UniProtKB/Swiss-Prot annotation:
It comes from Mus musculus (Mouse). Signal peptide: none annotated. GO terms for cellular component: cytosol; Mpp10 complex; nucleolus; nucleoplasm; preribosome; small-subunit processome. This is U3 small nucleolar ribonucleoprotein protein IMP3. GO terms for molecular function: rRNA binding. Part of the small subunit (SSU) processome, composed of more than 70 proteins and the RNA chaperone small nucleolar RNA (snoRNA) U3. Component of a heterotrimeric complex containing IMP3, IMP4 and MPHOSPH10. Interacts with MPHOSPH10.
């Protein structure tokens, strides 16, 4: 037997319709992206979503301007150059490419995802652990934040830290280890 509901519980239940509730797909898509790219906080996803929405909105406003407008030409070129340099669009072709920018585009440029792409890690979970533990550097700087976005120009400079045991094991496996270099 079920107990009688208290007054405040009845008031709360009046606000909920258990028979006709809407299913929103946004939450499911959000959870898929969070799980697929191993995002640690939901705020990261919402931030990427806001940025992608702003890019799409800016591209739409630029497309609404007349085609011969010098401001449109300059701003479109600057926007496409910026997005291409960040790695969010594949080419500098046209403003139509800006419509494909999404939160997943930003997630694909995160450091752990690029470690997976560069075959420095087998799984995304391991890549996140390598970054958090300080085994990876981008250029001269050691990066410990998995949310670090890597641009196209910095993609070539993603390597292991010199003092990393993982680098030592990789070099030993490939028979390229030099005792003089690694004793630093």
């Amino acid at each position: 037997m079920v107990r009688k509901l208290k007054f405040h519980e009845q008031k709360l239940l009046k606000q909920v319709d258990f028979l006709n509730w809407e299913v929103t797909d946004h939450n499911l898509h959000e959870l898929r992206v969070l799980r697929r790219y191993r995002l640690q906080r939901r705020e990261e996803y919402t931030r990427y979503n806001q940025l992608s929405r702003a890019v799409r909105e800016l591209a739409r406003r630029l497309r609404d301007l007349p085609e011969r407008d010098p401001f449109r030409v300059r701003a479109s070129a600057a926007l496409l150059d910026k997005l291409y340099a960040m790695g969010l669009v594949p080419t500098r072709g046209s403003l139509e490419l800006c419509d494909s920018v999404s939160a997943s585009s930003f997630c694909r440029r995160r450091l752990p995802t690029l470690l997976l792409k560069l075959r420095m890690a087998q799984h995304l979970q391991a890549a996140v652990a390598f970054v958090e533990q300080g085994h990876v550097r981008v250029g001269p700087d050691v990066v410990t934040d998995p949310a670090f976005l890597v641009t196209r120009s910095m993609e070539d400079f993603v390597t292991w830290v010199d003092s990393s045991k993982i680098k030592r094991h990789v070099l030993e496996y490939n028979e390229e280890r030099d005792d003089f270099d690694l004793d630093a």
